[in-house]
C-alpha cells in the first residue's frame, strides 16, 4: 500500500498544472472540498491516516485567495497516486449528480 498526500488543488479544474492540478482538466472537479474527498475516500475503502484542515499547498501561496483550497489528507491506497486521484474525482462527480 502506498501512502501519499492528497491536496484538494490536485483535483481542482480551475487551476493549471503549474498550481498543482494532477489529473487532466476533463476529469477534474470545480472547487472540490475536503469533506467531499474524505467522504469519497471512505466510500472507496481507502485508509485515511491524517486530516489537516489548516494546511495550504505551497504552490498556492502566490495565487488569488478565491482559488486557494486549504487542507490535506494523508491516504493509504493500494493504487498509485494518479489512479487514486482519478477514482476520487470520478466518485465526487457521481455524488454531485445525485444531489
From Swiss-Prot:
It holds the Pfam family SRP19. One of its GO terms (biological process) is SRP-dependent cotranslational protein targeting to membrane. GO terms for cellular component: signal recognition particle. The keyword DNA-binding does not apply. It comes from the Archaea. Its main location: cytoplasm. Gene3D superfamilies: Signal recognition particle, SRP19-like subunit (3.30.56.30). The keyword Ribonucleoprotein applies. It is found in: Cytoplasm. InterPro entries: Signal_recog_particle_SRP19, SRP19-like_sf, SRP19_arc-type. One of its GO terms (molecular function) is 7S RNA binding. Keywords: Cytoplasm, Ribonucleoprotein, RNA-binding, Signal recognition particle. SUPFAM superfamilies: SRP19. NCBIfam families: PRK03745.1 (NF002993). Involved in targeting and insertion of nascent membrane proteins into the cytoplasmic membrane. Binds directly to 7S RNA and mediates binding of the 54 kDa subunit of the SRP. Part of the signal recognition particle protein translocation system, which is composed of SRP and FtsY. Archaeal SRP consists of a 7S RNA molecule of 300 nucleotides and two protein subunits: SRP54 and SRP19. Belongs to the SRP19 family. This is Signal recognition particle 19 kDa protein. It comes from Pyrococcus horikoshii (strain ATCC 700860 / DSM 12428 / JCM 9974 / NBRC 100139 / OT-3).
Amino acid at each position: 500500500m502506498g501512502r501519499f498526500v492528497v491536496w484538494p488543488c490536485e483535483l481542482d479544474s480551475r487551476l493549471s498544472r503549474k498550481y498543482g492540478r494532477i489529473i487532466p482538466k476533463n476529469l477534474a472537479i470545480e472547487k472540490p472540498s475536503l469533506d467531499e474527498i474524505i467522504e469519497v475516500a471512505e466510500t472507496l475503502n481507502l485508509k485515511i491516516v491524517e486530516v489537516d484542515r489548516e494546511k495550504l499547498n505551497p504552490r498556492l501561496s502566490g495565487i488569488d485567495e478565491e482559488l486557494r483550497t486549504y487542507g490535506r489528507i494523508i491516504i493509504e491506497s493500494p493504487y498509485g497516486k494518479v489512479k487514486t486521484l482519478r477514482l476520487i474525482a470520478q466518485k465526487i462527480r457521481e455524488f454531485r449528480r445525485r444531489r
